[in-house]
Amino acid sequence: MPRTRGTRQSGDSVDGTVALLPVSSTMPRDLGSLLTPAHSALLTMECQEAVIGDHALFPALVEAVHTSGLRRNLGALAGRARAAGVPVVHNLALRRPDGGGSATNCKLLALGRRSSTVLTAGSSAAALVPELGPEPGDYQVGRLHGVSPFHGTELDPILRNLGVTTVVVTGVSLNVGVLGLVIEAVNRGFQVVLPRDCVAGTPPEYVALLLEHTYGLLATIVTSAEVAAAWER
């Protein structure tokens, strides 16, 4: 069987280890069956004013969001999800005014604690960016601690009670939070679809490597247009 340059067949070995197949050959591409509206949900990750708004803590991430068109693309995809009857679930980072219940056991959380902006529930800082609403039928799941949204929240039972088997993961950042969300979803048996134009991280060259070598092994990577088309079939 002919081979293309730079690819390996299953069972090939390098230095005695079994090589992986190219990512594109290992992930499902039948989006019609993977993304049936009755069994899929759109998850947004920390698309909040204090995270990706104009005065957010990490300017480089805000710039990446702007460059990618994430807010516009995700706002449009959320509208298509609602129109198709697909639940939209917003995962929010929240903090009490006194910081109670939130640890600083890693550098990322410690940086957040030192910020003058407090993500108090109901505050403008904790609010979703305008492109995402929320609309009355949306779900909002907050967490006081940690860097990803499944642990210690209602996210898992909400999805299971809605009959969801595939989650479409969007938001920020590909560096940490989205990665935690994707891994936890896989651990819980969900299929994961990742629209590349609805996620962002920094720096760009690292994001490209993450998508190819990490997310490509965990999720079906597509565009928001492909997701919307599958929901409209």
PLM regions with names:
Residues 2-41, 76-84, 109-233:
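Active-site-adjacent betaalpha module
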Residues 43-47:
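N-terminal nucleotide-binding beta1-loop-alpha1 segment
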Residues 48-53:
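Short acidic, Gly/Ser-rich segments with clustered Asp/Glu that frequently serve as metal-coordination loops
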Residues 54-55, 101:
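Short, solvent-exposed loop/turn and secondary-structure capping segments
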Residues 57-67:
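Short glycine-enriched, charge-decorated loop/helix-capping segments at active-site entrances
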Residues 70:
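Nucleic-acid-processing active sites and adjacent nucleic-acid-binding tracks
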Residues 73, 77-100:
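Von Willebrand factor
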